Amino acid sequence: MTANGRRGHRRAQSSIIGVAVLVAVTVLSVGALTMAAGTFVSDGVAASNAQRVADDLDRIDDGDGATRIEFSRGTLRVEPRTVRLLRGGITVVGVEADALVYESGGRRVTSLNGLVVDGRGNQSRTRGPLPVVAGDGRLLVDIVALNASGSTAVGGSDPVSVTVRTNATHEYRTFEEDRYAVAIETATPGAWDRAFAAAGLERSRRDFDGDGVPSVVVSVPESVVVDLAVHDLRTVVRRG
């Protein structure tokens, strides 16, 4: 083969290799874009579901009636949680408040003690008025108990419709002036801590029953009279 022939042969080989590399890069790029698009769509669906469920959970604590919760994937379940009123570090009132929790695609929305928490960790945020308010020598405390019956977990990968029905009763008590604190057991303590910090309340954390789920303990530095309201929602959870 002549020198010119060898050069032409090498150019032809280089062209073939270049085309092959270009095709491979294109295939990989399309695959990456497809995966990214799929992830984006999945994240968008999870975010949309979480927002819709958060809006629905906001309405449950309004009192009596039925609330329909709909989502295309994920799980809605009841988790055990306790809210405590403490005097001198000792529990004087303990209520099994429980939490209604929705999870999907890494997103989490929780309704606990009248407050909705959307998200996890440092990204979590609260929605609604705080159940503990201090001022003028008094501590106003709301405890909202789901008292749930029916399904304890509903969900799957197909569209789901859940009806949450409540029939609330209310109990009011006043406790004489002393040093009090309120402990709210929660799997998202950061959101509660930030909300109470913004309200100027003192916070600490404590695991009362050793189950690994901490309670955010809220207190005021002086003696106060406590006005306590316990709202028993008597919740029934049903698919459909």
Functional labels for PLM-detected ranges:
Residues 1-61:
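Hydrophobic alpha-helical segments
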Residues 16-17, 60, 69, 90, ...:
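Weak global preference for isoleucine
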Residues 36-130, 147, 168:
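Extracellular/luminal recognition modules and glycoprotein regions
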Residues 93-223, 240:
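Intrinsically disordered, low-complexity regions enriched in Pro/Ser/Thr/Gly and acidic residues
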Residues 224-240:
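Short, low-complexity, Pro/Ser/Thr/Gly-rich segments in the mature regions of secreted, periplasmic
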